[in-house]
From Swiss-Prot:
PANTHER family given in the database record: 54S RIBOSOMAL PROTEIN BL35M, LARGE RIBOSOMAL SUBUNIT PROTEIN BL35M
Record flagged with keyword Ribonucleoprotein: yes
Gene (UniProt): rpmI
Gene3D superfamilies with a match to the protein in the record: 4.10.410.60
Gene Ontology BP, a term: translation
Species annotation: Thiobacillus denitrificans (strain ATCC 25259 / T1)
Sorted UniProt keywords: Ribonucleoprotein, Ribosomal protein
Gene Ontology cellular-component terms listed: cytosolic large ribosomal subunit
Gene Ontology molecular function terms on file: structural constituent of ribosome
Protein name, entry field: Large ribosomal subunit protein bL35
Taxonomy, superkingdom: Bacteria
Entry's family note: Belongs to the bacterial ribosomal protein bL35 family.
Length: 65
């Protein structure tokens, strides 16, 4: 049986965690940052874990993660 393909867009956006979860970065941090408050930009830094309701969909897109 041939190898399954990962969704390349998802592979660039999600990283697998040791416990079976996934981490992702926040949106809204690429451009138009001047009108956003310092507090908002600070809270958008770093990584976030994928919500449990989306976990199955992300896992299906990344079969080898």
């Amino acid at each position: 049986m041939p190898k399954m393909k990962s969704k390349s867009g998802a592979a660039k956006r999600f990283r697998a965690l040791g416990g079976g979860g996934f981490k992702r970065s926040h949106a809204f941090m690429r451009h138009i940052l001047t009108k956003k408050s310092t507090k908002r930009k600070r809270q958008l830094r770093g990584m976030e874990t994928v919500n449990a309701s989306n976990h199955k969909a992300v896992a299906r897109m990344l079969p080898y993660a």
